[in-house]
Amino acid sequence: QRTLKVSSSGPRSFSSRSFSSGPSSRISSSSYSRVGSNSSFRSGVGFGPNYGMGLGSSIGVGGITAVSVNQSLLNPLKLELDPSIQAVRTQEKEQIKTLNNKFASFIDKVRFLEQQNKILETKWSFLQQQKTSQSNLDGLFEKYITNLRRQLDSMGQEKLKLEVELGNMQGLVEDFKKKYEDEINKRTEMENEFVLIKKDVDEAYMNKVELESRLEGLTDEINFLRHLYEEEIKEMQSQISDTSVVVSMDNSRSLDLDGIIADVRAQYEEIANRSRAEAETMYQIKYEELQLLAGKHGDDLRHTKTEISE
């Protein structure tokens, strides 16, 4: 045991003390005070929730009394806790932390929503104050809508005009398309006709070449006949001269051979002249025919060339 002595001279006071041992044991002592002639002393000892024990004493007015304290009561108690209880408490602490975090987030959300609510209230009040401006905006929008409707009507009328013009243009396109097709058909026909004309021109050219060759042949033949006739005339004249010589030699017989010679000469000259005239006439006729044929083919050739150039 330990004896604690307390003096009563003058006002005194001291605070309580506490001792703890383990998670659930606690020892506490009360305070002592004295004021004036009265004095008091209180003392107490407490433990955790599972074990409890108290010690108390009081001193009234008067002298100093010795107080005895059981020293064994001041020793810490060896208390052991159940591990399951510790786990439950840890889990409860974690749950409390989680709930505290959720509660804090809820509080933040509530504050944010309150701020948004205040902002919306401010906007609403501002919009309520701006009614006159909204009415002006309504008129402005109505004018704008009216203008748009007017533009829409004008666009509709212009659309009708454009549709009419489109129909006209489509008709013109169809007409030009038909004309184009007709021109293509005409071009095809002209190309075919050109091919035929070219064949005719080629044939005419070949005929012209043939006729020119024939003309040259006939010219050569006429020249040959003319030369032949001239030679025959010369031969006949030489024969006539020989006959006249013979007749003159026989003049001793006193025959009238001069008349006979004159008649024979006249007959030969007539035959020669007639043959010459017939040959010249035949040559002239053939020459004129060839000239006409050549002129005709020349005209056809010029006409064909003109059509080809066109």
Swiss-Prot record:
Residues 237-260 are annotated as: Linker 12. Residues 128-144 are annotated as: Linker 1. One of its GO terms (cellular component) is nuclear matrix. The modification Phosphotyrosine is found at residue 229. Residues 261-310 are annotated as: Coil 2. There is a cross-link at residues 5, 123, 131, 198, 286, 296, 305 (Glycyl lysine isopeptide (Lys-Gly) (interchain with G-Cter in SUMO2)). Residues 1-38 are annotated as: Disordered. Keywords: Acetylation, Coiled coil, Cytoplasm, Glycoprotein, Intermediate filament, Isopeptide bond, Keratin, Methylation, Nucleus, Phosphoprotein, Ubl conjugation. Residues 92-310 form the IF rod domain. Residues 92-127 are annotated as: Coil 1A. The modification N6-acetyllysine is found at residues 208, 296. The modification N6-malonyllysine is found at residue 102. InterPro entries: IF_rod_dom, Keratin_2_head, Keratin_II. The modification Phosphoserine is found at residues 7, 9, 15-16, 18, 21, 25, 28, 31, 33, 37, 254, 275. Residues 145-236 are annotated as: Coil 1B. O-glycosylated. O-GlcNAcylation at multiple sites increases solubility, and decreases stability by inducing proteasomal degradation. The modification Omega-N-methylarginine is found at residues 17, 26, 34, 42. Together with KRT19, helps to link the contractile apparatus to dystrophin at the costameres of striated muscle. This is Keratin, type II cytoskeletal 8. The gene is KRT8.
